[in-house]
Regions:
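Cysteine-centric segments in proteins
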Residues: 21-142
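C-terminal motif of bacterial Sec signal peptides marking the signal peptidase cleavage site
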Residues: 16-18
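Bacterial N-terminal signal peptides that target proteins for export
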Residues: 1-9
């Protein structure tokens, strides 16, 4: 009798855990207007960044030629200050936007940087950090 109760209790706990750990519904990422998010040419590499909050919004894109960032003030085009993957950019007003990649992890098809930050300066001179998860990937050459 004790064994039947134990089996029943265990089954109930497993059922409850199964219901409590279902995967949350995925939120569709917001697109950065004008970004070629998945149109890498063969042999081309890109950096793709999503916010780390609950929305997981698509907020950063960079390739060898261009970069775009969805800042708190709206989307801005960026010019790389070094070779790809650049970590220093300037916007059209000449303000610096820094990409701090942090520790990278190898993944199939590229690298991921789960604790990256995008750093900008406010008008008052304060540094604003935007947590971002970055993926670096390259489309194989044909």
């Amino acid at each position: 009798m004790m064994r039947v109760r134990l089996i029943g209790f265990t089954a109930s706990v497993l059922l409850l855990l199964g219901c409590a750990t279902t995967t949350p519904e995925t939120v569709k990422s917001a697109e950065i207007p004008g970004s070629p998010t998945s149109n890498l040419a063969p042999g081309q590499c890109g950096l793709f960044g999503w916010s780390t909050d609950d929305t997981r919004s698509f907020i950063f894109y960079a390739d060898e030629k261009s970069a775009r960032y969805a800042s708190a003030d709206g989307p801005i085009d960026l010019n790389a200050q070094s070779a790809f993957p650049a970590t220093e950019y300037r916007d059209t007003a000449g303000d610096t936007v820094s990409l701090r990649l942090g520790e990278g992890e190898t993944m199939v098809g590229g690298m991921r940087y789960p604790s990256a930050r995008i750093a900008t300066l406010t008008d008052e001179g304060w540094e604003r950090l935007q947590p971002v998860a970055i993926i670096k990937t390259c489309k194989p050459a044909e």
